[in-house]
Amino acid sequence: GHQGVDHIDPELYVRWMQFGAFSPILRSHSTKIAGLTKEPWVFSNEVSDILRGIIRQRYNMVPYIYTMAREAYETGLSLCRPMYYDYPETQEAYDYRNQYMFGNDVMVAPATSPMKDGYTEVKVWLPEGQWYEFASGKTLQGGQVLTRYFALDEYPIYIKAGAVLPMYNDKVMNLNGKDETIVLNVIPGKTSSEFTLYEDNGDDKNYQKEFATTAIHSEKTGSKLTLTIS
């Protein structure tokens, strides 16, 4: 948390950083205590590598996050929202209060308990439909509650089947560049889906009038997937 003990538990710090990567703002600052250092390189090599991966994942997700942030600006619907916003008729949406939607297509079920034998146990409610589990690469059937296990470098992230996720590739080094390559990740499982990518110069208030939107449509017919960008 922001204020408390005068030492940092590496496992807890990693889980906080994972949570931060799927929050509107990722920051690692806290109360000012001499010797309370939080830079990724002050931890063990294993933990430093995990923290580096978390930050890079956040960088990779920026095209999706920035688009969803613009939608929040336009509609007032938060980037992070409780499950009952999207599933108001389902009781589990109220019961599983830790879970939340991160934009329209990503669901997060934070790891909030310490590891046992190298894994954290998380009970996850998956709404109806199919969901892609980021950590395992598996497609899971929704409409049920599952018990899943996550190592320290894994986090409970689920993506709707059929979603189109625009992301930067792994070569992105900072967010100041204007010509970063955007990769479109299409999650299998639906016959068709859409996403409208939002872009502006990211520097000033010109976003109010000067911006670009790109419509992306995916269509699956049998084993053939067609992606249309317009």
Describe the predicted segments one by one:
Residues 1-154, 159-160:
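Catalytic-domain carbohydrate-binding cleft regions of carbohydrate-active enzymes
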Residues 152-230:
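Accessory, solvent-exposed terminal regions and/or long lumenal/extracellular loops of proteins
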